[in-house]
């Protein structure tokens, strides 16, 4: 049985860890609320943008649509992999690592040309050993990425040379559920994992007037805007999922520390009682020998 001093020191250390995990849980909960607010606003915007593109496409010339949306032979892919900047968030990063690795390996096995952009320090750590030869850009601080920075990132890249653009991210469903998701942002699609169905109004026939009256120019501009917004929305989804996963992980850690403290307190009391009993026996034995 461990000494009382050892048990006391261990209890002290676990209480210190418990304070840290409790603070991290509270901070993650506060950050989650902020992330959810940003995500809600982003979903509303991208849904309306999606509706506008759908409406313009419904009245556009088919030859023009073929010209804008027809891609090459689907041989070249750009894949964004979004993960967190820090750990202690359960399986948040490992699930993205597993999903993205399986997908990219399939593309490579099919002789596809694949370029990868890592967003987040953990994404960089994931790709360092797996896909380093395929990496064209690594951004370690994904939390610092704003809409303007995403726009600058997209503008700095020649996306026209890619037939397909994909984004791996953790989709936020609720506080307890986040799942790895693969979203296609090029070519544009009528369905998107970034858009909630209840926000879309695709059945409504909007009567838009354009200036200038150049459908091709407007569609290309909107599609470019959609790529930026979709990537930014995926980052917000990932941020909300990360904060939720970390909050859940810290809550679980708090429960575990409470259980450990209860067990150690019981063990400490038993050891203390045994020590007192031993001392009493020695005192009584000494008195009887006199």
UniProtKB/Swiss-Prot annotation:
A GO BP term here is: proton motive force-driven plasma membrane ATP synthesis
Q: Which GO terms describe its molecular function?
A: ATP binding; proton-transporting ATP synthase activity, rotational mechanism
Disulfide links within the chain: none
Q: How does it sit in the membrane?
A: Peripheral membrane protein
The transmembrane segments are none
Gene3D superfamilies assigned to the protein according to its UniProt record, in alphabetical order: 3.40.1380.10, ATP synthase, gamma subunit, helix hairpin domain (1.10.287.80)
Task: Name the CDD domains for this protein.
Answer: F1-ATPase_gamma
Q: Which GO terms describe its cellular component?
A: plasma membrane; proton-transporting ATP synthase complex
Q: Which domain of life is it from?
A: Bacteria
Localisation: Cell membrane
- Keywords on this record? ATP synthesis, Cell membrane, CF(1), Hydrogen ion transport, Ion transport, Membrane, Transport
Family assignment?
Belongs to the ATPase gamma chain family.
Question: What HAMAP family does this protein map onto?
Answer: ATP_synth_gamma_bact
UniProt xrefs under PANTHER family: ATP SYNTHASE GAMMA CHAIN (PTHR11693), ATP SYNTHASE SUBUNIT GAMMA, MITOCHONDRIAL (PTHR11693:SF22)
Q: How does it assemble?
A: F-type ATPases have 2 components, CF(1) - the catalytic core - and CF(0) - the membrane proton channel. CF(1) has five subunits: alpha(3), beta(3), gamma(1), delta(1), epsilon(1). CF(0) has three main subunits: a, b and c.
Q: What does this protein do?
A: Produces ATP from ADP in the presence of a proton gradient across the membrane. The gamma chain is believed to be important in regulating ATPase activity and the flow of protons through the CF(0) complex.
Stated name of the protein:
ATP synthase gamma chain
What organism is this sequence from?
Wolbachia sp. subsp. Brugia malayi (strain TRS)
């Amino acid at each position: 049985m461990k000494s009382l001093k050892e048990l006391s020191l261990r209890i002290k250390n676990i209480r210190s860890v418990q304070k840290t995990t409790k603070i991290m849980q509270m901070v993650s909960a506060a950050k989650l609320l902020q992330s959810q607010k940003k995500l809600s606003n982003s979903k509303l915007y991208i849904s309306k943008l999606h509706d506008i593109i759908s409406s313009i496409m419904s009245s556009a010339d088919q030859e023009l649509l073929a010209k804008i949306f027809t891609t090459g032979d689907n041989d070249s892919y750009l894949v964004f992999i979004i993960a967190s900047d820090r750990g202690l968030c359960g399986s948040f990063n490992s699930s993205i690592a597993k999903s993205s690795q399986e997908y990219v390996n399939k593309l490579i096995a099919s002789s596809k040309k694949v370029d990868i952009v890592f967003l987040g320090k953990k994404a960089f750590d994931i790709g360092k050993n797996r896909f380093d030869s395929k990496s064209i850009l690594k951004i370690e601080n994904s939390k610092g990425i704003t809409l303007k920075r995403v726009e600058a990132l997209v503008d700095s890249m020649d996306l026209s040379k890619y037939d397909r653009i994909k984004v791996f991210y953790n989709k936020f469903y609720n506080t307890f559920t986040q799942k790895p998701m693969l979203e296609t942002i090029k070519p544009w699609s009528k369905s998107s994992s970034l858009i909630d169905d209840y926000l879309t109004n695709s059945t409504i026939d909007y009567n838009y007037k354009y200036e200038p009256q150049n459908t091709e120019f407007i569609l290309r501009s909107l599609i470019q805007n959609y790529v930026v917004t979709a990537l930014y929305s995926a980052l917000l989804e990932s941020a909300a999922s990360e904060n939720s996963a970390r909050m859940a992980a810290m809550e679980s850690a708090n429960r575990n520390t409470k259980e450990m403290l209860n067990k150690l307190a019981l063990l400490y009391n038993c050891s203390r009682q045994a020590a007192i009993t031993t001392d009493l026996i020695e005192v009584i034995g000494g008195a009887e020998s006199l």
